[in-house]
From Swiss-Prot:
Keywords: Lipid metabolism
Segments of skewed composition (Basic and acidic residues): 494-508
Function: Positive regulator of phosphatidylinositol 4,5-bisphosphate turnover and negatively regulates signaling through the cell integrity pathway. Involved in rDNA silencing.
Pfam families attached to this UniProt entry: EH (PF12763)
Biological processes per GO annotation: lipid metabolic process
Gene3D superfamilies: EF-hand
Family designation: Belongs to the IRS4 family.
Protein name: Increased rDNA silencing protein 4
Residue ranges of the region described as Disordered: 292-315, 487-529
Species of origin: Kluyveromyces lactis (strain ATCC 8585 / CBS 2359 / DSM 70799 / NBRC 1267 / NRRL Y-1140 / WM37) (Yeast)
Matches recorded under InterPro entries: EF-hand-dom_pair, EH_dom
Domain EH: 508-604
Length: 638
């Protein structure tokens, strides 16, 4: 840092380096307070102030949170003695490098301490406020004396001396309000405070964990120390017990961004650097707006996890880049910074697949149960990509489920997308989906696609008639009685030739009588042959045998439908026989006698008419009558 006097306007008072380190703790502030006290001591001594440890004054600095931004920092000092000394006003000017470059006006605060001891205490308080702004890198505070125009506070012993910091005109600050109280106690407290400050070095307290809850920790490793000339002049810093060459390990949540900004080479032992910083989504997902986000999701999405296992809350989860729980050790001899992992078993696991497993969840739970936690698992895989992939799948599945009626339920709080780590703890439950598609005809199980109506349907009759038309009137000449009329005609012609020589008168009369008799018999045979034709019994058995039924069963069917008894079947018999073969294939028994409506359904159209008194109702009536008769008989006997 470079310093200037109050009268110089061209040069800035304090040059604060801008940094993104947000890991701070209370002990780090107390250690840096010592350097700030020495800095303000140099300024206040030249103006007639004594900046030293005030006897009877105890200084406590609560940690300043970053949850809600504010612009005012108040410090309250209560006097316990009845001193009526005159007050000397002091101006603490809060200056920002940005505002000084742009020429913006700066705000100030007025301090009216009661006594010289009060001035020293308030100087320490101003140093704490200056250190707070120095760490943030946004603004700086300079303590200068002011005239009486700013106003002096003259009140009773119970009055309150307030320090009020007003930011420069229009300058927006993102620091939150922190209240610092100054309580005057016995001199033993001030001595204990002085011993405590003298025993603490700047480097030995940077890495100590913070005891405050709900705020993110901030490491001071890598921050430039004050100039050596200034440290030599300071009596407090020169009397440190620990030497500068002593290497003190620092434990804390350290990110790769922090180590990359250091001007020393870094050696990683036992772990890999976090090459993937904490990614912040620009907009939330729709399902997160509806169902919200849980703590486990916040930690996996880049939330900061402290050393004691508590996760950071508020907006710091997305603002703080998480790091690996590591131990820093500065080797001054070799000018090298060594980064070691606290837990040797913790190793960076890189993502190899988009499939989710239970290993990530189990390791995270084991780490929390063991009292330590690491954000290494959050960067071992691209959690943002997994969440994006999972949310896209969930959106597509929800659309398909609305159309198909499939419901995904929740079991044990782990639903389809619970508020946990991406790809962990999900259970999908699919309901049984039954398709209503019409199945094709199964030849092995034909009875499943058949409805028994007790007669030949129109569809079945058309199928049977197609077979009849293609095979009728075939091979009928094999029958013994089919060619007999032709042979009789040839014999008659031969007899006529022999009887030519005989007398024509007597013989003609006899021949006419014989011809009349033969013609009558031929007409009777022609009348027996139907117009639809006939089918030979050999062809019938060949067609029916393709059903793989036994020959005995096929013979029984043929005997039931044969009405001619001459080795042929007419149309009605053939269609009825085909229907009986199908009924046997459907698994039904062969009836003893064929119903008349089956014969009628071959040549006629069957129309189904609803029956008002079906057969099963008649049976019920008979049973009811029998029960009534039994009850009547019992009544008569009694």
């Amino acid at each position: 840092m470079r310093f200037r006097s109050r009268h110089q306007v061209d040069k800035p008072n304090v040059i604060v380096t801008q940094s993104n380190r947000k890991n701070e703790d209370r002990l780090g502030e107390d250690a840096s307070l010592k350097a700030a006290q020495a800095m303000f001591k140099k300024h206040t001594v030249s103006q007639g102030f004594a900046v030293s440890d005030a006897p009877g004054t105890k200084l406590s600095l609560p940690n300043s949170g970053h949850g809600t931004p504010a612009h005012n920092v108040q410090a309250m000092a209560r006097s316990s003695s009845s001193s009526s000394a005159t007050s000397t006003p002091i101006n603490i000017i809060r200056r920002s490098p940005r505002s000084s470059l742009k020429g913006k006006p700066m705000g100030g605060l007025s301090v009216s301490p009661r006594t010289v001891e009060g001035n020293a205490a308030l100087s320490q308080q101003a140093a704490a406020v200056a250190l707070e702004n120095e760490i943030s890198g946004d603004e700086s505070i300079v303590l200068v004396p002011a005239g009486n125009s700013n106003g002096s506070m003259t009140r009773s012993n119970s009055s309150i001396n307030a320090i009020r910091i007003v930011p420069g005109g229009g300058l927006s600050s993102s620091r939150s309000s922190s209240k610092v109280s100054i309580v005057k106690n016995s001199p033993t407290h001030s001595l204990a405070l002085a011993d405590k400050l003298n025993s603490i070095t700047l480097e030995s307290v940077y890495g100590k964990p913070s005891t405050a809850t709900g705020t993110a920790t901030r490491t001071l490793a890598g921050r430039k120390a004050p100039p050596a000339a200034f440290i030599d002049q300071d009596s407090v810093l020169s009397n440190d017990k620990h030497s500068e060459n002593e290497d003190t390990p620092i434990k804390g949540t350290i990110s790769y961004d922090t180590t990359a900004r250091m001007n020393v080479p870094v050696t990683y032992e036992g772990t890999l650097p976090d090459l993937i910083p904490g990614h912040q989504r620009h907009k939330k997902k729709k399902w997160r707006n509806i169902f919200g986000s849980s703590a486990t999701h916040g930690s996996s999405a880049g939330g900061a996890i402290g050393i004691n296992g508590t996760s950071a809350s508020g907006n710091d989860q997305y603002e703080n880049p998480s790091g690996t729980l590591s131990e820093l050790q500065l080797n001054r001899a070799e000018d090298n910074l060594i980064v070691k992992s606290v837990n040797p078993t913790q190793k960076t696991r890189l993502q190899t697949t988009l499939r989710s497993n239970d290993y990530d969840r189990n390791s995270e739970l084991a780490a929390v149960a063991g009292g330590y936690s690491s954000d290494e698992s959050a960067f071992s895989s691209d959690s943002d990509r997994e969440l994006h992939y999972a949310t896209d799948n969930h959106h597509n599945n929800s659309i398909n489920n609305h159309s198909s009626g499939v419901y995904y339920g929740n079991v044990g709080g782990n639903g389809v997308y619970n508020g946990g780590t991406a790809g962990v703890g999900r259970t999908k439950h699919r309901a049984m989906v039954r398709s209503h598609k019409r199945k094709s005809f199964n030849e092995d199980k034909p009875w499943k696609s058949h409805v028994d109506i007790g007669y030949i349907s129109e569809r079945e009759r058309k199928r049977y008639e197609g077979i009849w038309v293609t095979n009728r009137n075939s091979y009928l000449e094999l029958l013994p009685w089919w060619n007999q009329p032709l042979q009789d005609e040839e014999q008659e012609q031969e007899q006529e030739r022999e009887m030519d020589h005989e007398s024509q008168h007597g013989l003609e009369e006899e021949l006419e009588e014989e011809r009349e008799q033969e013609s009558g018999q031929g007409q009777e045979q022609d009348a027996d042959i139907p117009e639809d034709g006939l089918m030979l019994n050999l062809i019938v058995m060949e067609i029916w045998s393709r059903s793989n039924l036994s020959n005995q069963l096929l013979g029984q069917i043929y005997d039931k439908v044969d009405t001619r008894h001459d080795g042929t079947l007419n149309r009605q018999s053939f269609l009825t026989g085909m229907w009986l073969v199908d009924q046997c294939l459907y698994g039904r028994k062969l009836p003893k006698q064929i119903d008349q409506r089956v014969w009628d359904s071959v040549d006629k159209f069957v129309i189904s008419i609803p029956n008002n008194n079906p057969h099963h109702r008649h049976r019920r009536r008979k049973k009811m009558l029998r029960k009534e008769l039994k009850t009547i008989k019992k009544d008569l006997k009694t």
